[in-house]
C-alpha cells in the first residue's frame, strides 16, 4: 500500500525518465552502473514502482523545494539553456581522455558522473529529480537546510578514488614540514588581516551610508532574482596549502578528481572549509613524515656520523626517533585509507583520537629528552670539530633545502602541538551537537593531555637541575628551608631595591635610600636574599607564596616611581613583615606583582566571564621566553590582553591552551575588529567547553540521577 508521499515522489521521477529517454546517454550517465540484467528500464508501471525507491537518494522532498526548482526553471531563459548545452556537448568526447589522465580504472569510474558528461536530457532529469546540488543550493531552497537528512548522506553515492591516486598525491608533496608549517601559519596570519580589514571596512561603510534600510528592502525584493542565478558555491580557503610549483595541487577543492566529480556544486561552503581542514591534517602529516625520514636517512644513518659519535651520544641526540617515525607511518597509512573510502572525507578525528590515546606516548618520551638533547648538541659542536664540519656539510645538501640540523631535531615537539591546533580547526567547522563534534572534542582532549605531558616532561628535567643549582648557592642566615622538592619549581628570580628609610648623618647628608635584595620566587615559596661575593646568596627571610600580598603605590614622584609594597602575612619568624620594593621599570614592577600575588579577585571567576571584551592580539613574530614568567609565542597564536605596560610588555592568555605569561608587544599586532574578537572567543569556548567545570559537574549529576532511577 502506497502513501501520498510515495505518489508525489514517483511523479517527477517518471517525468525525468520520459525526458531522459529522448537522449541515448542520459540514464547511463546519471545513475550508478547496474548489473547487465538490470540495465534496461522496466516498461510496466508495477515494475517501475518496485524499482523506483532504490534509485532515490534519501533526501526528503518538501513543497518549498519543488517551488524553488520550478522558479529556477522559469527564470532561466531559452538562450541560456542552449548556451549551456552547447558548452557541455563538446566536452562529452573528452570524458574518456580526462579519466585516463587521472590513472583511474575504467571499471571504477561509472558510479559517479562528471559535469562534462551532461546533455540536455540528463540535465533536465537531474534538475527534476530529488537529488540536491545539481544547480540548486540551500540558499535557493530553505527546505534543504531544514531537512533532517544532510547533504553528506547523499555523497555516499559517490564512488571512492583508487588507492594509487591518493598515494601518488601524497608522495608528490614537495615541501618539508618546516616549510609547510611556516607557509601555513604565515597564510593564516595574512588571512586574519584581510578578514579584519574587510569586516572593518564594511562596518565603516555601513556607518557612513544613510540608506541602509532601503538597501535591505531592495535586497529582500531581489531574493527571487537570486534564485535564478545561483551564487558561487566555492568557499574561500582559510589556509593556502602547498603553494609550491613542484606540487600539482594546492587545496582539496583544487584536486582534479574533486573538480571533475561535481561535488563542489553539492557541498555548502562551510562543508568545503571542513574538508580543507581535514585535508590539511592529512597532507601535513605526509610532509612531517617526509622530514622525519630525511632526519633518519640523511643524518642518523650516516656512516661517518656513526663513527664520530659515541653510542651514548647518538642515543641522547636522536632518542627514540625511530619509534616516532614508525607511529607516524602507521598514522599516515590509516589517514590515507580513510581518504580512499570517498572523495568527500567523512572524518579523521576518530583516527587521531585512537592514536593519541594508544600510540602517541612515543612523543612524550622524545620531547622529555629535549633538555639533554640540546645540551649534548651544543657540547658536540664545541668539543668535536669533526662533528661540526660533518653537520655543516650535511646541511648544505639540497635535500635539506637550507634548513639546519636543529630544525629536524625539534620536529616531533612541533608536530604534536600543531596537530592539536589542526584538530581545533576541524572542531570549529563541524556541526554543533553532532557525532563529528563529539569525536573532535575527544581527539582534542587526548591530544591536549599528550601535549601537557610533553611540556611537563621537558620542565621536569630542567627544573630538577635548576633547583639543585639554586640550593648550592644559598646560605641561610635564618632557619634553613629545604629548597629541592619534586613539586616545587622556580617562577621568577631577580634583583629589586628595598627602601630602608631616610637616615640622616651628623653632616646632614641623607644616606642611601634603597639597597639591593635578591628574590627567588617558587610556585609555593618566596625566599628573600642578599647577594654576597662568590656568586652566593644569603637568605634572611622567607614566606609561603599563599601568604603574600602586594599593593601598588600611587604616583609619588620620580623617587618613588615603580615602587610597590610586599606584605608577608607570616614570615620565617612567624611574624608579619612589610617590604617597600622598587623595580627598574614599570613592566618589571607589574611582572613582579603578577608573579608574587596573582589577581585573587579573578581566581574563582569563570573562564568565559573574565575574557569578555578583552583586547586581542595575534603573534606575527615568534618569541622564545627568556624568563620563567614569560610566554613562548608561535606564529598565528591568538592571545587575550590581560595587562599592558607603557614600556611595551603584555601579560596575556593564549586562547588555544589558556597558558599565561609576559611577552613584548612588538611581537604581536592587535585585532581591532570586535566581530573578529567575538568570533575568536566563541571558537575558544567551543573548543574548551569539555573542560568547563560547571558543564562536567552537571554531566556528573545527570549520570548520578540516571543511576538512581535505575
Curated annotation (Swiss-Prot):
InterPro entries given in the database record: DBL_dom_sf, DH_dom, Ephexin-1_SH3, Ephexin-like, PH-like_dom_sf, PH_domain, PH_ephexin, SH3-like_dom_sf
Region feature Regulatory region, mapped onto this chain: 1-272
Any GO MF annotation of the entry: guanyl-nucleotide exchange factor activity
Record PTM Phosphotyrosine, positions in chain: 177
GO biological process entries: cell differentiation; ephrin receptor signaling pathway; negative regulation of dendritic spine morphogenesis; nervous system development; regulation of GTPase activity; regulation of synapse pruning
Residues annotated as domain DH: 273-457
Tissue: Highly expressed in brain and to a lower extent in eye.
Bias type Basic and acidic residues, positions: 1-20, 688-699
Free-text comment on this protein's domains from its UniProt entry: The DH domain and the PH domain are both required to mediate interaction with EPHA4.
Protein name stated in the entry: Ephexin-1
Organism of this sequence: Mus musculus
